[in-house]
Each structure stands twice: as structure tokens, then as C-alpha cells.
Amino acid sequence: MASETVSNHQEKALALLQADAEKILRLIKVQMDNLTMPQCPLYEEVLDTQMFGLSREVDFAVRLGLIGEEQGKAMLGELERELSALHEAFTNKQQ
């Protein structure tokens, strides 16, 4: 019973983290579609704040043992790659 509860908590934690990551990914995709980052510094600030918040959530879940450290790193790494692609796309547009 206890292991079932732990497993349930782990699944819920992962689902919540993935939902938050998906929200950030949608923000990134909107920026990619519009490539308006410098015209909207507030949007970039929101992305940075959301990424920081998610990193804290992931750290907390890892410390509780709800997700593995590698799982958390992979989730954040994917979003960081998307952000990097956004910055690269905008830089290429400016050239």
C-alpha cells in the first residue's frame, strides 16, 4: 500500500512538472512564431521567471525523491534547448 502511494505521488509530481514545462514550451513557441523578443522584453522576463520557477520545482521534486535527478535535468535541458533555438532564430532574423 505504501509503495503504491509513493508511486502515485511520483506520477502526480511528474505530471505536474510536465504540465508546467509544456506551458513554458508554449510560450517559447509563440515567441518562435513571432520572433519579437526584443520588442517585448517583458515576455523574455516571463520566460526567465517561468524557467527559474520550474527549476526550483524540479529541484524540490528531486530532493523529495519524487523524480530522478536525470529526469529533472532532461526536462530542463529540453526547454533550455528550445530557448537557445529561439535566441538563435531571432539572431538569424536580425542578420
Swiss-Prot record:
Cysteines engaged in disulfide bonds, as pairs: none
Domain of life: Bacteria
One Pfam family from the record: DUF1507
SUPFAM superfamilies: EF2458-like (SSF140404)
Family: Belongs to the UPF0358 family.
Cross-referenced HAMAP family: UPF0358
Protein name according to UniProt: UPF0358 protein BcerKBAB4_3775
